[in-house]
């Protein structure tokens, strides 16, 4: 199956087992992201993705912090779709627009904690020496 054969579903066009999952996501974030809309073809895949998303939300990082990490990773890996999607989510979570823009273009945000998280995420993606970013992250609280 080629990429062009994947359908991005709506809450109405998705298989029945995916409809409620998509509706719940739409209720949470205000829209159905294309990634989830495409995953909806397989209710098991969509359910697993949403379960992982939910589990990630149970950690000690705030939604803004998680999205800053996601933007930094997406920027490093060159995933323009992911940069756009996570920027939207970050702003919806209340991230400062200046911080989102800084991370999108590979700069550090002014907030010390967000800076430490972005630097750490970039270092991990680059497989660089993570010692200095880890110390900075620990020092930021």
Question: Where do the language-model regions lie?
Answer:
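Hydrophobic alpha-helical segments
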Residues: 1-141
């Amino acid at each position: 199956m080629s990429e062009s054969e994947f359908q991005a579903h709506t809450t109405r066009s998705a298989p029945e087992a995916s409809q409620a999952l998509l509706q719940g996501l739409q209720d949470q974030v205000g829209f159905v992201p294309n990634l989830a809309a495409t995953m909806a073809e397989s209710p098991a895949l969509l359910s697993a993705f949403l379960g992982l998303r939910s589990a990630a939300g149970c950690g000690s990082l705030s939604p803004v912090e998680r999205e800053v990490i996601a933007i930094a990773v997406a920027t490093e890996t060159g995933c323009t779709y992911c940069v756009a999607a996570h920027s939207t989510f970050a702003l919806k979570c209340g991230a400062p627009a200046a911080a989102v823009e800084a991370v999108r273009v590979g700069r550090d945000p002014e907030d010390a904690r967000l800076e430490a998280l972005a630097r750490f995420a970039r270092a991990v993606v680059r497989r660089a020496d993570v010692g200095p970013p880890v110390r900075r992250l620990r020092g930021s609280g």
